[in-house]
Amino acid sequence: MIEPLDSPASDSDFLDYPSALGNCTDEQISFKMQYLPVIYSIIFLVGFPGNTVAISIYIFKMRPWRGSTVIMLNLALTDLLYLTSLPFLIHYYASGENWIFGDFMCKFIRFGFHFNLYSSILFLTCFSLFRYVVIIHPMSCFSIQKTRWAVVACAGVWVISLVAVMPMTFLITSTTRTNRSACLDLTSSDDLTTIKWYNLILTATTFCLPLVIVTLCYTTIISTLTHGPRTHSCFKQKARRLTILLLLVFYICFLPFHILRVIRIESRLLSISCSIESHIHEAYIVSRPLAALNTFGNLLLYVVVSNNFQQAFCSIVRCKASGDLEQGKKDSCSNNP
């Protein structure tokens, strides 16, 4: 049985963390060596060039800029910043959790993951609210479509994300164990009581609330388009695609990670069997790159949101748009926020 961790561990206990847990984490270290480098490598190899191309399109090809263009550009930027940190994590897990880049980089890389996570959540929430106003309150959309409102919203997202994630630089720790430096994530760091309450507040304000907002926005949008007078097939089809994509990102990528992070922290605070804690930790490990897969969903979102983006992408890769794409551009609903 594992002793409850109701108070901060001593330095000797902390440095002997794997020994204190016995065999609870032995299999996880091996599992992480096999699983995380592969998944993170795939995410990096697809996401880095994909977001680089997306940013280039938004900056050099997309004119005029709408509110949605500003939000999508900021979303691509935060994804790209996160993707640049993945090679460090790939090396770390592939080497058996041996961190060679120092304490500052440990905190910076862990900070980068969570900053991207909550920036993405908030940018997608802003986009959903803009779509809601355009479709449900179309008379107000002429004001909200102006790019200055999107710029203000994006600036707010950057500030809120920075403030929300900043405490992690103090809570996340690195340590030395068995002659190796380990860069611990939030759930494995010390001071669990503080981490528990910080995690609950962070999850409630920057995930649960946006999840409710996004769900309500898109259920209202679909209901309005289904029963309302606006029945343009192109508009309805595009709204359905956006709804499915956004809800998949929130419920498949983000939700499991947040649920399992709460459970993982609680499992370290409670006196439970090594077997149960091992299974909880393993499930949490699986959920971490799953959360990072939102970068794939975002790449699809760029294409779904705008037919102009599709045309610009085709021009970059030197391909000719199909007749359907040309027709889609003519018939596309131009009410993007």
Swiss-Prot record:
PROSITE patterns: G_PROTEIN_RECEP_F1_2 (PS50262). Keywords: Cell membrane, Disulfide bond, G-protein coupled receptor, Glycoprotein, Immunity, Innate immunity, Membrane, Receptor, Transducer, Transmembrane, Transmembrane helix. This is 2-oxoglutarate receptor 1. The chain crosses the membrane at residues 39-59, 70-90, 117-137, 152-172, 201-221, 243-263, 285-305. Disulfide bonds join C106-C183. Predominantly expressed in the kidney with limited expression in the testis and the smooth muscle. Expressed in SLC26A4/pendrin-positive type B and non-A non-B intercalated cells (at protein level). One of its GO terms (cellular component) is plasma membrane. It comes from the Eukaryota. Glycans are attached at N23. GO terms for molecular function: AMP binding; G protein-coupled adenosine receptor activity; G protein-coupled receptor activity; purine nucleoside binding. Signal peptide: none annotated. Residues 1-38, 91-116, 173-200, 264-284 are extracellular. One of its GO terms (biological process) is phospholipase C-activating G protein-coupled receptor signaling pathway. It is found in: Cell membrane. Belongs to the G-protein coupled receptor 1 family. The gene is Oxgr1. It comes from Mus musculus (Mouse). Residues 60-69, 138-151, 222-242, 306-337 are cytoplasmic. It holds the Pfam family 7tm_1. G protein-coupled receptor for dicarboxylates and amino dicarboxylates. Receptor for itaconate produced by activated macrophages upon bacterial infection. In the respiratory epithelium, couples the binding of itaconate to the activation of GNA11 and downstream intracellular Ca(2+) release, leading to mucocilliary clearance of airborne pathogens. Receptor for leukotriene E4 (LTE4) produced by mast cells upon allergic inflammation. Binds with high affinity to LTE4 and elicits mucin release from pulmonary epithelium in response to airborne fungi allergens.
